[in-house]
């Protein structure tokens, strides 16, 4: 787990109430995916301005905004015991993928959702007469996050879109009713929202972003790292091009895009038969699915990824132990201390250090033209930091680092 991921998860967990007392143990053992999803939901609620209650061992959350209290229970689809993971199988054909989306996944979603439905959380004293919501994410096999959202939506509403371009060149979307999903001898009815007792569930929240990759991106965005790294995100997103039949492929360098919200990629499916309905604007920064005049419609605003992978191109550099007078500095801390730091046009900041009393800052830079290492030492004045020492053209990172630390100590001691 790299710095942005680890530091962002630690930051979120620092205010996370462990209501059942099992979070850390399960996070470190068999419940890593489920607990990561739960931590992601907490980060989303907290950073989106909801009041959060975790005074009860179940459900996982009660949130409140604008006077409305909503109870939320999280669940995940986990690997089947003894099942071979998809990354050990051959690539799926188009027909095999369609079968998985149309039948296998809906049955897995149904199993998890009905398991939670049968617990009847809405009958708990603190959940009575308020909306109850289930949040779900699929971790059952390698690659499941890439194709699970459409399967869930089809299963919940019991219909799927058939898209084609007509002779006039316009996109035509036709609704096809789904009656059942079948794998082997197991058959379940489609249309979860239309099954008995499901009126007690006001909505289903789905995300394919409740993973460590989300924490990596948010940590990188907040500058929670002490060595330079390039983080790239690529995947498929909603395509706003008129008549688009397929999602749009994207590649983002996160150094150039830093406005991701915790809700980006979140999907909210509202139950048309809910006993206690939720308005379409209650869950912020999320795509909304709901029924109007018998038709399922979607509100998607802004960048909406369906699936993605996050790649760290340059990883952390190995470092030895620092003297007690010096510590590493987050990039975000540096930006707060120094509003404008002039640097050579072909140099990249790689590491940042600061004295414990915050009077001395040290920077290590890589000259991209000749691949040599340089350092800059800055000292705090009356109103700002000023460069007091610069050395250039080191061949090894370890050498420039040792020289910088020695120079910083000479100003400290």
Locations of the language-model features?
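Acidic, metal-dependent phosphodiester-chemistry machinery of nucleic-acid enzymes
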Residues: 1-15, 20-28, 75-413
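Conserved catalytic cores of phosphodiester-cleaving nucleases, focusing on short active-site segments
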Residues: 61-63, 70-78
